[in-house]
Amino acid sequence: MRQFLFLISVLFANTIFSNITVYFNYGVFSTSSNKPYLETYLTISGNTVKFSPVSGGYQANVNISWKILKGKDIVKDSKYNLMSPIATDTLHLPSFIDNQRFSLDNGQYTLELIVTDNTNPEKKSIHVEKINIALNRDKKVYNSDIQILESFTKSANQSLLTKNGYDLIPYNIN
């Protein structure tokens, strides 16, 4: 009986700790030329991915795979590696963020997101969500979504986090 309970607890623990913790959020915005786009925000919990030794400390490396489908057709897709900041202390592993923008027309979409730890490929997180892009261009005034920020600073260089001359760090953990 003890062996059975031990086996069940090991399998249960393995299931719990096998996924990467990813916080996902998005907003729908309009460009200055009134074209809608989807902006995505990811926060990857540093203590759920493997940090490997690199020059100057330890770093995690994850693969991000996006697919945006309209019906069964792939409208946008992207696959890239995202590196964490370098950590000098493995007791305090930093979370890290990603921000992407996808130009889309009005319509119903399905977003598929897969985040895989490149150091431990069995460890992954999968998210699928329906997204509605509906900006009415016939109206003179309409709303985009709002972006909740953790912080912002005047931008020294243009990056994925830059909007109108400021680096906007999204607050993504609710």
Predicted regions and their residues:
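Sec-dependent N-terminal signal peptides
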Residues: 3-13
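Intrinsically disordered, low-complexity terminal regions enriched in Ser/Thr/Pro/Gly
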Residues: 17-174
